[in-house]
Amino acid sequence: MMMGCGESELKSADGEEAAAVPGPPPEPQVPQLRAPVPEPGLDLSLSPRPDSPQPRHGSPGRRKGRAERRGAARQRRQVRFRLTPPSPVRSEPQPAVPQELEMPVLKSSLALGLELRAAAGSHFDAAKAVEEQLRKSFQIRCGLEESVSEGLNVPRSKRLFRDLVSLQVPEEQVLNAALREKLALLPPQARAPHPKEPPGPGPDMTILCDPETLFYESPHLTLDGLPPLRLQLRPRPSEDTFLMHRTLRRWEA
Protein backbone atom coordinates (compact mmCIF):
# COMPACT_ATOMS: atom_id res chain seq x y z
CA MET A 1 0.00 0.00 0.00
CA MET A 2 2.78 2.38 0.81
CA MET A 3 4.51 1.64 -2.47
CA GLY A 4 1.26 2.06 -4.42
CA CYS A 5 0.50 5.38 -2.77
CA GLY A 6 4.01 6.62 -3.46
CA GLU A 7 3.82 5.64 -7.10
CA SER A 8 0.37 7.26 -7.51
CA GLU A 9 1.64 10.49 -5.92
CA LEU A 10 4.70 10.51 -8.17
CA LYS A 11 2.54 9.94 -11.25
CA SER A 12 0.15 12.76 -10.26
CA ALA A 13 3.07 15.11 -9.60
CA ASP A 14 4.66 14.18 -12.92
CA GLY A 15 1.34 14.78 -14.67
CA GLU A 16 0.93 18.21 -13.10
CA GLU A 17 4.47 19.16 -14.03
CA ALA A 18 3.90 17.95 -17.56
CA ALA A 19 0.69 19.97 -17.77
CA ALA A 20 2.41 23.05 -16.34
CA VAL A 21 5.34 22.94 -18.80
CA PRO A 22 4.30 25.04 -21.88
CA GLY A 23 5.34 24.39 -25.43
CA PRO A 24 8.36 25.87 -27.19
CA PRO A 25 8.51 29.73 -27.23
CA PRO A 26 7.35 31.46 -30.41
CA GLU A 27 10.01 32.46 -32.85
CA PRO A 28 10.65 36.22 -33.13
CA GLN A 29 9.18 37.88 -36.17
CA VAL A 30 11.89 39.45 -38.25
CA PRO A 31 10.65 42.40 -40.32
CA GLN A 32 11.38 42.04 -43.99
CA LEU A 33 13.22 44.91 -45.61
CA ARG A 34 11.60 46.06 -48.79
CA ALA A 35 14.48 47.93 -50.35
CA PRO A 36 17.85 46.23 -50.68
CA VAL A 37 19.59 49.34 -49.29
CA PRO A 38 22.09 48.26 -46.61
CA GLU A 39 21.39 49.81 -43.22
CA PRO A 40 24.26 51.30 -41.22
CA GLY A 41 23.44 49.33 -38.04
CA LEU A 42 20.77 47.35 -36.13
CA ASP A 43 20.21 47.45 -32.39
CA LEU A 44 19.09 43.97 -31.27
CA SER A 45 17.63 44.32 -27.76
CA LEU A 46 15.50 42.01 -25.58
CA SER A 47 13.20 43.26 -22.87
CA PRO A 48 12.52 40.28 -20.59
CA ARG A 49 10.63 40.78 -17.35
CA PRO A 50 12.89 39.81 -14.48
CA ASP A 51 11.29 37.08 -12.34
CA SER A 52 12.94 35.97 -9.13
CA PRO A 53 13.30 32.17 -8.88
CA GLN A 54 11.14 30.61 -6.18
CA PRO A 55 11.35 27.10 -4.66
CA ARG A 56 9.11 24.35 -6.07
CA HIS A 57 7.66 23.18 -2.75
CA GLY A 58 4.13 24.39 -2.15
CA SER A 59 0.56 23.72 -3.23
CA PRO A 60 -0.23 22.51 -6.77
CA GLY A 61 -2.35 25.64 -7.38
CA ARG A 62 0.61 27.87 -6.79
CA ARG A 63 2.76 25.73 -9.10
CA LYS A 64 0.16 26.01 -11.83
CA GLY A 65 -0.13 29.82 -11.49
CA ARG A 66 3.64 30.18 -11.55
CA ALA A 67 3.88 28.07 -14.69
CA GLU A 68 1.21 30.16 -16.42
CA ARG A 69 3.04 33.36 -15.57
CA ARG A 70 6.27 31.89 -16.95
CA GLY A 71 4.52 30.92 -20.18
CA ALA A 72 2.97 34.38 -20.52
CA ALA A 73 6.35 35.98 -19.90
CA ARG A 74 7.94 33.78 -22.56
CA GLN A 75 5.14 34.65 -25.00
CA ARG A 76 5.63 38.39 -24.32
CA ARG A 77 9.33 38.14 -25.14
CA GLN A 78 10.04 39.52 -28.57
CA VAL A 79 12.88 40.94 -30.55
CA ARG A 80 12.84 44.69 -31.06
CA PHE A 81 14.69 46.26 -33.94
CA ARG A 82 15.68 49.91 -33.73
CA LEU A 83 16.54 51.14 -37.18
CA THR A 84 18.63 54.25 -37.55
CA PRO A 85 17.61 56.65 -40.29
CA PRO A 86 19.31 55.75 -43.54
CA SER A 87 22.31 57.86 -44.36
CA PRO A 88 21.85 60.06 -47.40
CA VAL A 89 23.52 58.52 -50.38
CA ARG A 90 25.96 60.91 -51.94
CA SER A 91 25.25 61.31 -55.55
CA GLU A 92 28.37 61.17 -57.61
CA PRO A 93 28.91 64.24 -59.78
CA GLN A 94 28.17 63.54 -63.35
CA PRO A 95 31.00 64.14 -65.77
CA ALA A 96 30.80 67.48 -67.45
CA VAL A 97 29.62 67.44 -70.97
CA PRO A 98 32.46 68.56 -73.22
CA GLN A 99 31.59 71.94 -74.65
CA GLU A 100 32.39 72.84 -78.15
CA LEU A 101 35.00 75.54 -78.76
CA GLU A 102 33.65 78.87 -79.87
CA MET A 103 34.31 79.64 -83.47
CA PRO A 104 35.46 83.10 -84.58
CA VAL A 105 32.67 85.22 -85.94
CA LEU A 106 33.00 86.42 -89.47
CA LYS A 107 34.12 90.03 -89.94
CA SER A 108 35.08 90.34 -86.26
CA SER A 109 38.14 92.53 -87.03
CA LEU A 110 36.29 94.93 -89.27
CA ALA A 111 36.14 97.71 -86.65
CA LEU A 112 39.83 97.26 -85.84
CA GLY A 113 40.72 97.53 -89.51
CA LEU A 114 38.72 100.73 -89.85
CA GLU A 115 40.55 102.24 -86.85
CA LEU A 116 43.92 101.33 -88.33
CA ARG A 117 43.02 102.91 -91.67
CA ALA A 118 41.80 106.07 -89.97
CA ALA A 119 45.02 106.28 -87.92
CA ALA A 120 47.15 105.76 -91.05
CA GLY A 121 45.32 108.50 -92.94
CA SER A 122 45.44 111.07 -90.14
CA HIS A 123 48.42 113.31 -89.33
CA PHE A 124 50.64 112.03 -86.50
CA ASP A 125 51.29 114.61 -83.78
CA ALA A 126 54.40 113.52 -81.89
CA ALA A 127 54.08 116.07 -79.07
CA LYS A 128 50.48 115.14 -78.41
CA ALA A 129 51.33 111.43 -78.46
CA VAL A 130 54.17 111.92 -75.98
CA GLU A 131 51.95 114.01 -73.71
CA GLU A 132 49.22 111.39 -73.77
CA GLN A 133 51.73 108.62 -73.09
CA LEU A 134 53.17 110.53 -70.16
CA ARG A 135 49.71 111.13 -68.78
CA LYS A 136 48.74 107.47 -69.05
CA SER A 137 52.02 105.83 -68.02
CA PHE A 138 52.14 105.10 -64.29
CA GLN A 139 55.88 104.40 -64.15
CA ILE A 140 56.81 107.63 -65.88
CA ARG A 141 54.56 109.64 -63.58
CA CYS A 142 56.13 108.01 -60.52
CA GLY A 143 59.63 108.77 -61.82
CA LEU A 144 58.75 112.41 -62.45
CA GLU A 145 57.24 112.74 -58.99
CA GLU A 146 60.38 111.30 -57.39
CA SER A 147 62.70 113.63 -59.32
CA VAL A 148 60.56 116.67 -58.55
CA SER A 149 60.37 115.80 -54.85
CA GLU A 150 64.14 115.30 -54.71
CA GLY A 151 64.71 118.67 -56.35
CA LEU A 152 62.33 120.45 -54.01
CA ASN A 153 63.45 118.80 -50.79
CA VAL A 154 67.23 119.27 -51.24
CA PRO A 155 68.48 122.23 -49.15
CA ARG A 156 70.33 125.03 -50.86
CA SER A 157 73.57 124.23 -49.07
CA LYS A 158 73.69 120.78 -50.70
CA ARG A 159 72.75 121.71 -54.23
CA LEU A 160 75.36 120.71 -56.78
CA PHE A 161 74.48 123.23 -59.47
CA ARG A 162 73.32 126.68 -58.50
CA ASP A 163 73.39 128.04 -62.04
CA LEU A 164 73.10 126.70 -65.54
CA VAL A 165 75.84 124.32 -66.61
CA SER A 166 78.05 125.74 -69.35
CA LEU A 167 80.45 123.89 -71.60
CA GLN A 168 82.87 126.82 -71.72
CA VAL A 169 84.40 126.74 -68.26
CA PRO A 170 86.49 129.84 -67.37
CA GLU A 171 89.76 128.67 -65.86
CA GLU A 172 90.39 131.77 -63.74
CA GLN A 173 86.97 131.66 -62.08
CA VAL A 174 87.31 127.95 -61.33
CA LEU A 175 90.78 128.43 -59.81
CA ASN A 176 89.68 131.42 -57.75
CA ALA A 177 86.63 129.51 -56.46
CA ALA A 178 88.82 126.54 -55.52
CA LEU A 179 91.30 128.85 -53.78
CA ARG A 180 88.52 130.50 -51.79
CA GLU A 181 87.22 127.11 -50.72
CA LYS A 182 90.68 126.02 -49.57
CA LEU A 183 91.23 129.26 -47.66
CA ALA A 184 87.86 128.88 -45.98
CA LEU A 185 88.96 125.50 -44.65
CA LEU A 186 92.12 126.94 -43.02
CA PRO A 187 91.94 127.92 -39.32
CA PRO A 188 91.66 131.65 -38.68
CA GLN A 189 94.99 133.39 -38.02
CA ALA A 190 95.64 135.84 -35.18
CA ARG A 191 95.55 139.37 -36.53
CA ALA A 192 97.96 142.05 -35.29
CA PRO A 193 96.29 144.83 -33.27
CA HIS A 194 95.89 148.17 -34.99
CA PRO A 195 98.35 150.90 -33.86
CA LYS A 196 96.80 153.36 -31.43
CA GLU A 197 96.83 157.04 -32.19
CA PRO A 198 98.51 159.38 -29.65
CA PRO A 199 95.98 160.86 -27.25
CA GLY A 200 95.10 164.51 -27.76
CA PRO A 201 95.11 167.28 -25.15
CA GLY A 202 92.60 166.87 -22.33
CA PRO A 203 89.78 169.29 -21.62
CA ASP A 204 90.19 172.37 -19.46
CA MET A 205 88.90 171.74 -15.95
CA THR A 206 88.24 175.44 -15.28
CA ILE A 207 85.33 175.46 -17.70
CA LEU A 208 82.91 174.15 -15.12
CA CYS A 209 83.91 176.54 -12.32
CA ASP A 210 84.72 180.20 -11.89
CA PRO A 211 87.77 180.94 -9.66
CA GLU A 212 86.25 184.23 -8.53
CA THR A 213 83.25 182.49 -7.02
CA LEU A 214 85.31 180.08 -4.90
CA PHE A 215 85.42 180.99 -1.19
CA TYR A 216 86.97 179.25 1.75
CA GLU A 217 85.49 179.65 5.23
CA SER A 218 87.23 178.79 8.50
CA PRO A 219 85.72 179.07 11.99
CA HIS A 220 87.00 181.84 14.21
CA LEU A 221 86.36 181.17 17.86
CA THR A 222 86.83 184.01 20.30
CA LEU A 223 85.65 182.23 23.41
CA ASP A 224 88.32 180.60 25.51
CA GLY A 225 88.03 177.20 27.07
CA LEU A 226 86.37 175.41 24.12
CA PRO A 227 87.99 172.19 23.03
CA PRO A 228 89.61 172.11 19.62
CA LEU A 229 87.42 170.92 16.81
CA ARG A 230 88.07 167.49 15.35
CA LEU A 231 87.84 166.74 11.67
CA GLN A 232 85.08 164.27 10.79
CA LEU A 233 84.87 162.44 7.52
CA ARG A 234 81.71 162.84 5.57
CA PRO A 235 80.53 159.57 3.92
CA ARG A 236 80.08 159.56 0.16
CA PRO A 237 77.99 157.13 -1.94
CA SER A 238 79.79 154.13 -3.37
CA GLU A 239 78.96 155.01 -6.96
CA ASP A 240 81.13 158.15 -6.68
CA THR A 241 84.30 156.07 -6.28
CA PHE A 242 85.10 155.91 -10.01
CA LEU A 243 83.18 159.01 -10.98
CA MET A 244 86.28 160.99 -11.89
CA HIS A 245 87.73 158.03 -13.78
CA ARG A 246 84.59 157.61 -15.84
CA THR A 247 84.49 161.32 -16.51
CA LEU A 248 88.06 161.28 -17.82
CA ARG A 249 87.36 158.28 -20.05
CA ARG A 250 84.30 160.00 -21.43
CA TRP A 251 86.34 163.07 -22.23
CA GLU A 252 89.01 160.99 -23.94
CA ALA A 253 86.42 159.39 -26.18
From Swiss-Prot:
Q: PANTHER family recorded for this chain?
A: PROTEIN PHOSPHATASE 1 REGULATORY SUBUNIT 35
InterPro entries per the record? PPP1R35 (IPR033590), PPP1R35_C (IPR029135)
Effect the entry attributes to changing S47A: Does not affect centrosome localization. Does not affect interaction with RTTN
Sites bearing Phosphoserine, chain numbering: S47, S52
A single Gene Ontology molecular function, please? Answer: protein phosphatase inhibitor activity
**Which GO annotations describe the biological process of this protein?**
notochord morphogenesis; positive regulation of centriole elongation; positive regulation of cilium assembly
Mutagenesis or variant effect for S45D: Does not affect centrosome localization. Does not affect interaction with RTTN
Q: Which residues form a coiled coil?
A: none
Give the domain of life. Answer: Eukaryota
Recorded source organism is: Homo sapiens
Its subcellular locations are: Cytoplasm, Cytoskeleton, Microtubule organizing center, Centrosome; Cytoplasm, Cytoskeleton, Microtubule organizing center, Centrosome, Centriole
What job does the chain carry out? During centriole duplication, plays a role in the centriole elongation by promoting the recruitment of the microtubule-binding elongation machinery through its interaction with RTTN, leading to the centriole to centrosome conversion. In addition, may play a role in the primary cilia assembly.
- Name the keywords, alphabetized: Cytoplasm, Cytoskeleton, Phosphoprotein, Protein phosphatase inhibitor
* Subunit organization: Interacts with PPP1CA; this interaction mediates the PPP1CA phosphatase activity inhibition. Interacts with RTTN; this interaction allows the mutual recruitment to the centriole.
Protein's name according to its UniProt entry: Protein phosphatase 1 regulatory subunit 35
Q: Tell me what the record says results from S45A.
A: Does not affect centrosome localization. Does not affect interaction with RTTN
Q: So what family is this one in?
A: Belongs to the PPP1R35 family.
Location, primary (coarse class): cytoplasm
Q: Where is the composition biased (Basic residues)?
A: 59-80
Q: Which GO terms describe its cellular component?
A: centriole; centrosome; cytoplasm
Positions of the UniProt region annotated as Disordered: 1-98
